Amino acid sequence: MEANWTAFLFQAHEASHHQQQAAQNSLLPLLSSAVEPPDQKPLLPIPITQKPQGAPETLKDAIGIKKEKPKTSFVCTYCSKAFRDSYHLRRHESCHTGIKLVSRPKKTPTTVVPLISTIAGDSSRTSLVSTIAGILSTVTTSSSGTNPSSSASTTAMPVTQSVKKPSKPVKKNHACEMCGKAFRDVYHLNRHKLSHSDEKPFECPICNQRFKRKDRMTYHVRSHEGGITKPYTCSVCGKGFSRPDHLSCHVKHVHSTERPFKCQTCTAAFATKDRLRTHMVRHEGKVSCNICGKLLSAAYITSHLKTHGQSQSINCNTCKQGISKTCMSEETSNQKQQQQQQQQQQQQQQQQQQHVTSWPGKQVETLRLWEEAVKARKKEAANLCQTSTAATTPVTLTTPFSITSSVSSGTMSNPVTVAAAMSMRSPVNVSSAVNITSPMNIGHPVTITSPLSMTSPLTLTTPVNLPTPVTAPVNIAHPVTITSPMNLPTPMTLAAPLNIAMRPVESMPFLPQALPTSPPW
């Protein structure tokens, strides 16, 4: 009777339970050991990566748990330091190569098993079966690309994934005691400290040359192994370099458009500090070229000398040696002192001029200057035309010449050069012979505003040249009386205008000897 009743029940419910039959048969061994009393607490979320106790291998294959790989050491090729994974190795090698990593590869998100509802009474077996069946269907449908929500159990919460946290900035807690520069670890701090000392602990085994850093020694050893290789190639222009730091410097100097180092004096900007220091030399003290006198900075004085056909350096005016920064600073200070002295002298002269132009100092100073000028002109006239002493030395008049009193005759046997204006405002009487045996050059205007009388012979044995018509006009505005013979044996050249007012030509017999036979003249 019981067997027939059981067969009837299974036949009645065969259509409704046909879809869950496969999952129940595979999970019966697990469910037999997982039955709990009614007062059992809710089950906590179980990560998929965690293997349940007593689970068969089919569940492990369905969920897709990966086997742990054996740990392998990742060793740096530059300093032989070992790391636990390839990412940390590549991040460490970027310190040697100078190439920064863009970002760390993303981790695979962790999938969490949803929370299972409270299980109570005899229905615990059915609810547990349906829940685990829903989990299995979720995993299989998500791997095939279908929507997992359609086959998941109604008592299960949505699957959550871990959110990636933003990367924290690297802390640089290791500071140098000498310069204050900070580093992220002790290794880089110790490598930096070598720059403050002369210690070179790494020695080349071939040529015994010593280096401060091991990577520098490694690059040097490569030069002994069949020549210098250039394995580091620029991705932009294809140029090769033997060291990674040389490649990074090349990229910054040539291909980079960033100019973070700016000049405080002008608007120039540069990619590196070295180029900024080279530029700052232009704003320092300058040196004058000993050939052309042009002011140039010490950085460009050598190249400037090549334009004059010289390659040697200019010697310092202080120590007579080649120009250096110390000599430049001393010479710059000397130039500043000279400029300050010149400025003080100019200020004193300006103060004196202001005092002269003020009243009553203006009148006093004007009278003093006028008296000094009169004395100078009288002295020059007395030296030129002395009654008892002949002019035996060349006479050059470089200032305006005025004759304000009577002048007697004399003898001149040396050149007389009039390089400034000569003005006669009083009668000039020549009562004795006047002999001029050397050239007489008049390079400036000669103005005669008073009678000129010559009662004795005037002999000119050398040419009288009036060189230019602009700078040497001869103006005769008063009568000229010549009562004695006038001999002009040599040609008299008039290259400048000759203006004679209030006198007819017939009263001057000497003009036909100097002028052409017919006008214009």
UniProtKB/Swiss-Prot annotation:
Entry comment describing in which tissues the protein is expressed: Ubiquitously expressed. Highest levels in skeletal muscle and kidney.
Main location: nucleus
Region listing for Disordered, in residue ranges: 140-167
Positions carrying N6-acetyllysine: 362
Gene Ontology BP terms: angiogenesis; cellular defense response; endothelial cell development; positive regulation of endothelial cell differentiation; positive regulation of transcription by RNA polymerase II; regulation of transcription by RNA polymerase II
Family the entry assigns: Belongs to the krueppel C2H2-type zinc-finger protein family.
Pfam families, sorted: zf-C2H2, zf-C2H2_4
Entry coiled-coil feature ranges: none
Record's subunit section: Interacts with ARHGAP22.
UniProt-annotated location(s): Nucleus
Zn finger intervals (C2H2-type): 74-96, 174-196, 202-224, 232-255, 261-283, 287-308
Protein keywords: Acetylation, Activator, Cardiomyopathy, Disease variant, DNA-binding, Metal-binding, Nucleus, Repeat, Transcription, Transcription regulation, Zinc, Zinc-finger
Annotated SMART domains: ZnF_C2H2
UniProt keyword Amino-acid biosynthesis, yes or no: no
Disease tied to this protein: Cardiomyopathy, dilated, 1OO: A disorder characterized by ventricular dilation and impaired systolic function, resulting in congestive heart failure and arrhythmia. Patients are at risk of premature death. CMD1OO inheritance is autosomal dominant.
Sequence repeat intervals: 394-400, 445-451, 457-463, 479-485
InterPro entries assigned: Znf_C2H2_sf (IPR036236), Znf_C2H2_type (IPR013087)
Purpose of the protein: Possible transcription factor. Specifically binds to the CT/GC-rich region of the interleukin-3 promoter and mediates tax transactivation of IL-3.
Protein name, as recorded: Vascular endothelial zinc finger 1
MF terms in GO: DNA-binding transcription activator activity, RNA polymerase II-specific; DNA-binding transcription factor activity, RNA polymerase II-specific; RNA polymerase II transcription regulatory region sequence-specific DNA binding; zinc ion binding
Skewed-composition ranges (Low complexity): 140-155
Record has Membrane as a keyword: no
Listed GO CC annotations: nucleoplasm; nucleus
Region annotated 4 X 7 AA repeats of P-[LV]-T-[IL]-T-[ST]-P, chain positions: 394-485
